[in-house]
């Protein structure tokens, strides 16, 4: 199982089940049963309490009751490997070999680090004459026995999503056992799951220094590099794997294709993806990746067909339906709409598929002008997404206050002349769904401007400046900006330009359209003072509700609650007003509604700001052939119209909370 297959941590129950583990080790099963039932009265869905209850019941000879408890556990935690392991033990106690084998096989399919399951499988396979499968199970068991028990235990916890328990165990082990590659690799995988990619990179580099032939670690190293948007380096690692392990080339080729997508080589990626199709349900993800690349290239009909193939390859694949809806121009058939309703209502559908289906149904019903029902699905989808986001608006608001306190006019005056003198970057900032893709398409139609993508380079620099922080610690950024020397600031500017180089051709200017960079304009001005910055702004209710309707592939956690979106918009206005005060004239604000009303006038204004001559193809931007990777990709390939400006008014009866949270922002957004 790859590092990305680990499931999300289970929600902690209201009371601590850990004391019951000690009772289990002492085989005090009656006390375990009483304790687990007490916990379940407080938290009926408690994962570990349900498991301990089942274990106690089995050991007390009450196997049917144990199986009932496991059925309850499966309803709430269907990807918890130990429930299937315990179910296997229950069936074995009843001498039901076939269902026992099925249960143990399910357990190890979710979690390879279960020695007891492998041991039971080996014995059951031998007993039923399946010698080949018995040998495979014996081999897996032997592999686990070669690894330190502490590492196996921590790996098992990790694969069940228990990161908070796994991480201290493996760190303690490394403190006493030094550079042990399996332990280091596991800690890297935990870092990947926590999205601490810098730590994961360092650990995997160390593993490969010690064990250069460790292919699983090299594959995970490539995954980390892709997550860090260093796709060219990832391809080097994948090419090494494909050369050394040609019989498993297709195993690596899908990730290689993903790296190609990151580098803008979409046609090549489509061909590579097609080579890894297998005719199984696994093809659903491959068809989806093909469709995304086709959509980026503007191949709308081909993308629709590929999205439909993804839906057909895996029934209930919510992402395929949402991706069709996310084309913005696609209209579902009555049969597709009915199918989506049925899938969303199915109790067996997974949470991720359900939330994708909710957003897709919201868009489909909005297109049919069934606004009340559409809002109900949008609301449900957002509630599902918000429940797992962990977003805290207070953190963004606190960071904004720090930006304002640190990045004063005096701060910049004292550092005048610092940073790189390169004028190449044109930053487009603001909120998502604010017209930034339209501005990018207009500017990228100019002969001297390269349209790249939403580059993560600024965020990577910010992450390095922050270092590793605990949630309980005050952030080093942005205060750390005041500690940087002139040389360090210059190096940051050159690092940014180097990171962007892989996405450019020979045009003198390029666009970085990462909306959230508005939060880092102090850093950007420090390291790239000659860069141009364009603030793409949209009327607040339209902008916020458009974000509420959008399910983002990653990030943008503030968009899954109307109140959170409104608070974020107000914070954005506050910070942009600050940049206008301390860096007057450095940022050009472009109001989306003004572009729709007078496209040529706004195009001329944009090009004047960039110091470039007017070119008529910028007005006819929809004719420009280029890759567009955002949710607005189909919309910017059409002439401008006013259709989207007032769509929020169809949902006005349900937007009271949004208006209340926005407050005076609905009036002052043009100030």
Task: Name each region found by the language model.
Residues 42, 76, 110, 127, ...:
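Structural marker of alpha-solenoid helical repeat scaffolds
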Residues 14, 48, 82, 116, ...:
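Start-of-helix register in tetratricopeptide repeats
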Residues 370-372, 376-492, 636-637, 641:
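PAPS-dependent sulfotransferase catalytic core
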């Amino acid at each position: 199982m790859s590092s990305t297959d680990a499931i999300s941590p289970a929600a902690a129950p209201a009371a601590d089940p850990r004391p019951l583990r000690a009772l289990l080790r002492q085989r005090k099963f009656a006390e375990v049963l009483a304790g687990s039932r007490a916990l379940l009265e407080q938290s009926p869905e408690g994962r570990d309490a349900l498991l301990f209850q089942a274990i106690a019941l089995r050991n007390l000879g009450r196997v049917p009751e144990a199986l009932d408890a496991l059925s309850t556990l499966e309803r709430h935690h269907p990807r918890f490997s130990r429930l299937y392991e315990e179910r296997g033990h229950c069936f074995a106690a009843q001498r039901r070999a076939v269902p026992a084998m099925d249960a143990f096989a399910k357990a190890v399919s979710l979690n390879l680090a279960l020695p007891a399951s492998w041991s039971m499988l080996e014995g059951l396979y031998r007993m039923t004459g399946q010698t080949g499968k018995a040998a495979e199970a014996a081999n897996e068991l032997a592999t686990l026995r070669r690894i330190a028990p502490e590492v196996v235990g921590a790996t098992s916890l990790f694969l069940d999503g228990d990161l908070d328990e796994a991480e201290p165990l493996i760190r303690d082990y490394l403190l006493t056992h030094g550079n042990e590659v399996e332990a280091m690799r596991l800690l890297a995988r935990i870092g990947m799951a926590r999205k601490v990619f810098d730590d994961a990179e360092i650990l995997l580099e160390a593993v490969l220094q010690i064990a250069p032939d460790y292919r699983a670690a090299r594959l995970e190293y490539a995954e980390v590099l892709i997550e860090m948007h260093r796709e060219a380096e990832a391809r080097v690692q994948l090419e090494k794997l494909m050369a050394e392990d040609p019989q498993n080339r297709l195993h690596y080729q899908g990730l290689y294709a993903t790296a190609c997508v990151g580098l803008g080589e979409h046609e090549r990626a489509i061909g590579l993806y097609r080579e890894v199709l297998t005719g199984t349900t696994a093809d659903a993800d491959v068809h989806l990746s093909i469709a995304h690349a086709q959509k980026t290239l503007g191949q709308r009909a081909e993308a629709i067909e590929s999205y439909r193939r993804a839906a057909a390859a895996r029934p209930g694949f919510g992402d395929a339906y949402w991706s069709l809806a996310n084309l913005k121009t696609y209209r579902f058939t009555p049969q597709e709409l009915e199918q989506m309703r049925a899938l969303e209502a199915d109790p067996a559908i997974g949470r991720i598929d359900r939330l994708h289906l909710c957003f897709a149904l919201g868009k489909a019903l909005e297109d049919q002008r069934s606004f009340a029902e559409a809002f109900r699905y949008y609301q449900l989808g957002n509630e599902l997404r918000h429940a797992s986001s962990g977003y805290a608006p207070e953190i963004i608001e606190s960071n904004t206050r720090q930006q304002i306190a640190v990045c004063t006019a005096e701060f910049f005056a004292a550092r005048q002349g610092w940073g790189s003198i390169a004028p190449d970057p044109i930053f487009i900032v603001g909120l998502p769904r604010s017209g930034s893709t339209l501005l990018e398409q207009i500017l990228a139609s100019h002969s001297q401007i390269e349209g790249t993508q939403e580059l993560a380079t600024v965020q990577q620099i910010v992450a390095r400046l922050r270092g590793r922080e605990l949630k309980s610690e005050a952030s080093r950024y942005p205060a750390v900006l005041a500690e940087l020397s002139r040389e360090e600031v210059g190096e940051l500017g050159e690092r940014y330009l180097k990171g962007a180089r892989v996405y450019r051709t020979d045009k003198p200017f390029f666009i970085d359209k990462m909306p959230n960079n508005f939060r880092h304009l102090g850093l950007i001005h420090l390291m790239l003072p000659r860069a141009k910055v364009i603030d793409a702004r949209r009327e607040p209710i339209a902008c916020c509700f458009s974000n509420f309707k959008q399910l983002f592939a990653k990030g943008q956690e503030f968009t899954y609650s109307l109140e959170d979106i409104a608070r974020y918009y107000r914070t954005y206005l506050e910070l942009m007003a600050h940049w206008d005060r301390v860096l007057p004239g450095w940022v050009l604000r472009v109001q989306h509604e003004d572009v729709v009303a007078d496209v040529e006038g706004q195009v001329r204004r944009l090009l004047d700001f960039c110091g470039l001559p007017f070119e008529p193809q910028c007005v006819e931007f929809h004719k420009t052939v280029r890759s567009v990777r955002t949710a607005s990709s189909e919309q910017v390939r059409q002439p401008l119209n006013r259709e989207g400006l007032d769509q929020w008014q169809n949902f006005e009866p349900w937007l009271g909370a949004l208006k209340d949270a926005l407050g005076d922002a609905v009036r002052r957004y043009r100030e």
